[in-house]
């Protein structure tokens, strides 16, 4: 929804549909994509990746690679990273752009792929984040405005990247939690230049931050996995940053591993959760400063999503 909390008060979606009922149109989309399409007026924007099948003979074939967890293999073929714009009324392709072509540096889980981050727009510019393959900015007619390569990261067990960019006015938030040096950074949305970047003491994560206004400040609320996988003595955290400068406004401990669900903020309370190697959901007031671990409104340790 428009506030990132799963709610659209003005929506009137159909409650029943099938292959034939309540379907206005249906069109095939080439490739694979796990990101959510977005809508601006009469345009739909979505991302996809296509395996071209063009093999680099210098790289090992998937069947010749050592066995990895979940049978994940590293590609040896070139992929095209696609940005699509469809007509909302008809499904017709208005424009299609190949953002980049490259061989991904690592594999992904079978339930993930290389187009997992959802695009975002302010109605003027469109921001498309393909993780280690790059960040691309277009106008709504498909003209490329700028692009940036923010470097490669490696995700534990090669599960793949998945955190989406968040746009607030003229700032773009990029969170990159991984098995190396995790970071959060804010870019100038007009030209892609870095405004600030901060290191994070956490590991793999896929949770998109929540950006909220509170008491004349804009907070970037993030969840963070345990810095040491499986070590219950070092719990995961909720960390709130000042959008302007990256300073930590408040934080609290109490999460488990693999931060995947996005924080939800409602009526001054952040609801944050993790669901791997234990369950945890925290309700934390966003009005605090510093360590808020003892000021949690409530906590539950069951039934959280993963």
Regions from the PLM with identified roles:
Residues 1-306:
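Noncatalytic, solvent-exposed loop/strand surfaces
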